[in-house]
From Swiss-Prot:
It comes from Methanocaldococcus jannaschii (strain ATCC 43067 / DSM 2661 / JAL-1 / JCM 10045 / NBRC 100440). Gene3D superfamilies: 3.60.21.50. InterPro entries: Calcineurin-like_PHP_ApaH, DNA_pol_delta/II_ssu, Metallo-depent_PP-like, Pol2_small_arc. This is DNA polymerase II small subunit. The lineage of its organism: Archaea, Methanobacteriati, Methanobacteriota, Methanomada group, Methanococci. NCBIfam families: PRK04036.1-3 (NF003118), PRK04036.1-4 (NF003119). GO terms for biological process: DNA catabolic process; DNA strand elongation involved in DNA replication. Its EC number is 2.7.7.7, 3.1.11.1.
Amino acid sequence: MEIINKFLDLEALLSPTVYEKLKNFDEEKLKRLIQKIREFKKYNNAFILLDEKFLDIFLQKDLDEIINEYKDFDFIFYYTGEEEKEKPKEVKKEIKKETEEKIEKEKIEFVKKEEKEQFIKKSDEDVEEKLKQLISKEEKKEDFDAERAKRYEHITKIKESVNSRIKWIAKDIDAVIEIYEDSDVSGKSTCTGTIEDFVKYFRDRFERLKVFIERKAQRKGYPLKDIKKMKGQKDIFVVGIVSDVDSTRNGNLIVRIEDTEDEATLILPKEKIEAGKIPDDILLDEVIGAIGTVSKSGSSIYVDEIIRPALPPKEPKRIDEEIYMAFLSDIHVGSKEFLHKEFEKFIRFLNGDVDNELEEKVVSRLKYICIAGDLVDGVGVYPGQEEDLYEVDIIEQYREIAMYLDQIPEHISIIISPGNHDAVRPAEPQPKLPEKITKLFNRDNIYFVGNPCTLNIHGFDTLLYHGRSFDDLVGQIRAASYENPVTIMKELIKRRLLCPTYGGRCPIAPEHKDYLVIDRDIDILHTGHIHINGYGIYRGVVMVNSGTFQEQTDFQKRMGISPTPAIVPIINMAKVGEKGHYLEWDRGVLEVRY
């Protein structure tokens, strides 16, 4: 105990092995060791755990050599894997205080011998317990680092492990990618959360969607402030943003709308709703047009028709070159449920590990991969998440996914937007991943964009959106379901809005421009988030929800959600809408679906 206290005075703890060795030191040798540590502490005042490694260093090396090599050494990080911040300092003070109290009690002369022995025994046990805990944490860190290094070494050898003689046709085709910067909030965020921000946000949404509605109606809408003067008039057309939705006892739907100057009440008759002439799935904050008859009092409009700013119907986009695009999302590297074997198998497929002519043809012509968010599982996304992680360092999570993507053939261009598990703000629109993350990816042909973002990829206007608003829409619209993602995606296309309602489960940042409005007549809408694959074509727009590489989580079990992991959608960009244009790589097998 006396030896332990001498080192505690220096703010140094002894590992059990070192403690046993020091008990065999003669007094002079022990004194020299203590003096050398005391001199070293003048240059590095960190709390020291004297394990066998550092005991040998202090015994065998000159003091000047130790100071030069270890004066800036982060001992806290060496022991725990964490930087020395405020908490370790508090822990250091706490241990020092406890130690001083123990020593002071030990020096009290009137304590009875039996009590003193009992106290010493208990103190010895306490110190030993602290030592065991520190040693255990140190050993766990060493095991953890070794496991990580082994994992990284394996990932870096995926590409070279594939012996392929495929002729890479896509390698000779130039990538054509244009990012529509006006669709990406990255570097352009203006909101500070003021009332003025909210006013500008909703005004921008209203004005931009009003243009599409008036274009569809082929006429201008009346200002709502004029409706009161139009008592009894028919065929009156108005446009507004929905501020309230309610129903009457007899089943009519009451919808309040606003424009920039006034508000009005729309009455959607029950019989027209039941006949399918007008919809009943009106959402708060969406922008709609209405045609109807003004009441005799001028207080409301009886609606005959609802006009939404939906994308116009068209033929699906096709190009002349037969090349392929694959869609990923929700990879969730870092989660214990991450399907690393299946993900590795997919990367091997991309490198030419194929079993038949169809697979060889597709992989030889695959030119693009879009990733719609949640590359990693993140840290602190939900309470208790650390229990679900095999990698608790978010930088290392990104380093790992970067290493995986680096194993993909160089001629394949990769586009990445973030999701709610990624290291960006949770509120949408989300900026692209920060530089401290993107610098981990060692590829020239990788494009980082925000969420949402629209790009032109080889002639296809492609909108990437992670899909967090799906959690709100499923509860708001009867026709929308998790099991069939395209039922949700259709609702976005109808409204030209990726997240219609403010204040739901999907947080929205009130930018002065609403980046969640779908400005362009897109060719592809790519989403993720709900971990269930879905595919369809609506109004000529290819709708792809790209599933996941994460096994079913406990949360999904509680919610009754059954994911479809390790399925990768792939489209033939020359045959969209035709037989054989849509394929799925399903856990190692490529099959034509449509």
